Swiss-Prot record:
Protein name: Demethylmenaquinone methyltransferase
Pathway field: Quinol/quinone metabolism; menaquinone biosynthesis; menaquinol from 1,4-dihydroxy-2-naphthoate: step 2/2
UniProt cross-references to Gene3D superfamilies, sorted A to Z: Vaccinia Virus protein VP39
GO molecular function: demethylmenaquinone methyltransferase activity; methyltransferase activity
Reaction catalysed by this enzyme: a 2-demethylmenaquinol + S-adenosyl-L-methionine = a menaquinol + S-adenosyl-L-homocysteine + H(+)
Gene (UniProt): menG
């Protein structure tokens, strides 16, 4: 399977990511012009985690994002449904679990925080995934969604769309182990809702205080919220 369709059949998506795993981190850095490192640091900072806390890094892929989160001193586990991606990150010494975002292999109220970076867009049933994230998070615990979004400047947005549909596939052919997967990436980004719509979807799944912050002119947005309950967010 070289690429998934926009209906996002879980088996097709997992197979697609297995196919890009070998050069995934390099390809991301090249295609983002190095911005992926900044986005990971911003995610860690926005999540506001620290020593003694438990964090689930969902759709963690090769666990490069999980390693960044551990710099906070928190205990972090990487979860992904692509076994190939987890295997590609075997050298990264963090706990790793294979699992589906809509059926997480964890009990209720386990984590102080949950994050998903560039993964929610690849889940067929996003509401189910957001509810599962809430289930495994303690009351007062935090959610951070880092995802591609809609640039706020109209001229920049036009240039960005041209990059997605024209330049990105060409660059992917030069560096990726599965360049056709990046055609899916471009199409899925263009089909993804804007910041306000995603915030509404997160709230509808049971998260409170949902807000967002744009990065790189809105190419990426961080959506944050907390699980309502007796404890208050720290």
């Amino acid at each position: 399977m070289s690429r998934a369709a926009l209906d996002k059949d879980p088996r097709d998506v997992a197979s697609m990511f297995d196919g890009v795993a070998r050069k995934y981190d390099l390809t991301n850095t090249v295609l983002s012009l190095g911005q992926d490192r900044y986005w990971r640091r911003a995610t860690r900072s926005a999540l506001r985690i620290g020593p003694g806390q438990k964090v689930l890094d969902l759709a963690a892929g090769t666990a490069v994002s999980t390693v960044e989160l551990t710099k906070s001193g928190a205990w972090c586990v990487a979860a992904d449904f692509s076994v190939g991606m987890l295997a590609a990150g075997a050298a990264r010494k963090v706990p790793k679990v294979a699992g589906d975002a809509t059926r997480l292999p964890f009990g209720d109220d386990v984590f102080d925080a949950v994050t998903i970076s560039f993964g929610l867009r690849n889940v067929a049933n996003q509401q189910a995934a957001l509810r599962e994230m809430a289930r495994v998070t303690r009351p007062g615990g935090r959610l951070l969604v880092c995802e591609f979004s809609t640039p706020t400047n109209a001229l920049f947005a036009t240039a960005y769309k041209e990059y997605l549909m024209r330049a990105l596939p060409r660059v992917a052919r030069a560096v990726s182990s599965n360049p056709e997967a990046y055609e899916y990436l471009a199409e899925s980004i263009r089909a993804w809702p804007d910041q306000a719509v995603l915030a509404h979807q997160i709230s509808r799944a049971g998260w409170s205080g949902v807000r967002w912050r744009n990065l790189t002119g809105g190419i990426v947005a961080l959506h944050a919220g907390y699980k309502p309950g007796k404890q208050t967010p720290q």
